[in-house]
Each structure stands twice: as structure tokens, then as C-alpha cells.
């Protein structure tokens, strides 16, 4: 059982807008746009302080379509289609286990692209996703984030089951073993 002694936070974002397109000699088209600038999602995160600088944490996050409430990836096979993990923090860093954003995907805390859980950061590493990472979210993942080492941080992930069991794990080896110092 999880007890909310230290902190539990419910968070999310809703982004939609109205788009209007008018071509010369034609009628205007008015549409509702989902996720115009950011991702529609909600989540719950929590941390339990174990003392001596140690803590356990979790994150459960779901994306959705603002106009109809459906999940944003239409897979229907996950309770939380964005992130779902449990982790441990100590003076040696963080380790997490579960469904986690790929290293170069701009998704989640373990990405080397500088993204946050709220997708508020941009990065100069714009081509790393297409060059190395073949997915945005990885299942069955172990992720490590080092503490600050004189201005440097190490990000590392490993997954033996990125999308589904029918895929060969070796086809994702570069993405899973890629690390970054920075």
C-alpha cells in the first residue's frame, strides 16, 4: 500500500484551440484543434521520504484527446499510455522501473533532450530522436539518472520490450544503450 505521508500530486494539462482557415473565393473552415501547443494529459506522482536522503517515488500519466476524452494513442491496451513507473532515489542517483520516455524522445525526466514531465523545455538536440530513438515511450525499462557530478549528469536506460514481445530487442539496442553526459 502507498501512504501519502510525504507528497502526492495530481497534475495535468488541457490544450485546445479554434483554427480558422479561409481560402480566396471559399467559405471559412472553423475547427477545434487538440493539443495545439502542448500535450493533453493528466497524472499522479508521489514521493515517500525514507530518511537519510533516500526516497521512493512513482508516476502514472495518461494522455487524452481533449475534444472527446479518448486516449491519445488509440491503443486501448494501457491504463497509463505515457508514463507508469516506480523508482528509488539515494545519494548515488535515481533508478526507475516501468514505462518511461526514451532517452532522445523529449518525453519524461530521463530524456537527454531536456524535457520535463510538463513538456516545458526545448533542446538543441532536435535530430537525436530520428537518428537513434525508434519510439517515444519504452516498456519494461530500467532508467538511471546520476546526481550532479561537478556539472555533469549521466542518463542511461535499458529496455527488453520496447513495444511488444514480437519485436526483436536487438533492433532497439542503440536507443536503449545510448547514454549522455551533460
Language-model regions, residue ranges each:
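Outer membrane beta-barrel
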Residues: 5-20, 29-161, 166-168, 175-180
Amino acid at each position: 500500500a502507498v501512504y501519502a505521508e510525504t507528497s502526492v500530486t495530481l497534475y495535468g494539462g488541457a490544450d485546445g484551440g479554434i483554427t480558422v482557415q479561409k481560402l480566396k473565393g471559399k467559405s471559412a473552415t472553423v475547427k477545434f484543434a487538440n493539443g495545439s501547443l502542448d500535450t493533453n494529459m493528466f497524472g499522479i506522482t508521489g514521493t515517500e521520504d525514507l530518511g537519510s536522503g533516500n526516497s521512493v517515488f512513482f508516476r502514472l500519466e495518461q494522455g487524452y484527446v481533449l475534444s472527446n476524452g479518448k486516449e491519445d494513442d488509440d491503443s486501448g491496451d494501457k491504463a497509463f499510455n505515457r508514463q507508469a513507473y516506480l523508482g528509488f532515489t539515494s545519494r548515488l542517483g535515481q533508478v526507475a522501473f516501468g514505462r518511461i520516455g526514451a532517452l532522445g524522445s523529449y518525453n519524461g525526466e530521463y530524456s537527454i533532450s531536456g524535457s520535463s514531465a510538463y513538456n516545458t523545455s526545448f533542446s538543441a538536440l532536435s535530430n537525436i530522436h530520428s537518428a537513434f530513438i525508434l519510439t517515444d515511450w519504452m516498456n519494461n525499462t530500467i532508467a538511471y539518472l546520476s546526481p550532479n557530478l561537478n556539472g555533469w549528469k549521466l542518463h542511461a536506460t535499458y529496455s527488453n520490450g520496447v513495444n511488444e514481445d514480437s519485436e526483436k530487442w536487438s533492433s532497439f539496442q542503440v536507443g536503449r544503450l545510448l547514454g549522455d553526459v551533460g
